[in-house]
Amino acid sequence: MEKRLLGRTGHSSTVVTFGAIVLGKSNLPQKKLDSIVDLAINQHGINHIDIAPSYGNSMEALAPSIPKIRNKIFLGTKTAIKDKKGAWENIQSCLKRLKVENVDLLQLHGISTMAELDQVTMKNGALTAIVESRQKGITKWIGITGHGPEAPKVHLEALQRFDFDTIMFPMSPSIWRNEKYKISSKKLLKYAKANNVGIQCIKMLARGGWGNSTPDCTTWYDPHRTQDEIDASLWWLLSQPIHTAPSTGEITVLPKILNAAQRFYPLTKEEEVQAIDRQKTPIKEPRLGIIN
């Protein structure tokens, strides 16, 4: 699988990160969960894991595999707690649940509005706890994540306030059809590239929302499911100036994502346009900016 340098971290991440949220979305036995980790890390060579304390029991599910893979993965986790004291306690809990002493990347989780950014960057906000974590050797790098229509704009402002090492925000062909979102994303990507910031993009398969329909996937948005759709969506995303994309929380599409990543080739500009034009949004999802 192709690798790309994750900004200033110096780590060459595989273009797909293992989204460990998938481990917390099911009640599978530990042996099966171990096999999912093995599929991603050992069989497909993924060397970057994304996880968060809010992803169900994903940390407990991943912990048994960590001693066998820790020396070959870049481990990123997050805290969604906004204040310093709560964030520090949350970070300590993450280490305990994962059974590790440190991680490679510690991120502010779900910062999607200016109000949330104000909360975490104020005196005694969560960012202070993360900075102190770096000083104590708990993490090497600091990042910010978020999703929603304002995420690119918020993250661009965040980079003005603090020199984050990485960002993580949504991008997919369906989301890109939102012109306002596309414009703000391009500004963020340009700034990130100029300042050697690692770029991670989530929601690679998002095509719309559920509305009043009954979800048939574990994701809170409606994802692409077929191999052809996944190929088109992932290849489009990886043809943009990003570094890596975490896999989704729906276990049935994980093998297809890995398959697509192994066969990735950069799309031509014409193919990129076609990938966007072919998108069909059965139901809009304003929470991701999918409005047409």
Protein language model features and the residues they cover:
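N-terminal binding-site loop/beta-alpha segment at the start of enzyme catalytic domains
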Residues: M1-I73, A129
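Conserved, mostly hydrophobic/aromatic
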Residues: L6, F18, I49, L62, ...
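Acidic (Asp/Glu)-rich catalytic clusters
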Residues: G7-S12, I41-N42, L62-N71, Q92-E101, ...
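Acidic-and-aromatic substrate-binding clefts and catalytic sites of carbohydrate-active enzymes
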Residues: G24-P29, A52-E60, A80-A87, M114-A115, ...
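Short, acidic/polar
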Residues: N27-I41, K84-K99, P149-L159, D228-L234
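A short, structured active-site edge motif that brings together acidic residues
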Residues: K72-D83, L105-H109, F169-P173
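Active-site groove signature of glycoside hydrolases
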Residues: L95-D118
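Beta/alpha (TIM)-barrel catalytic core signal, keyed to glycine-rich beta->alpha loops juxtaposed to Asp/Glu
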Residues: I111-N292
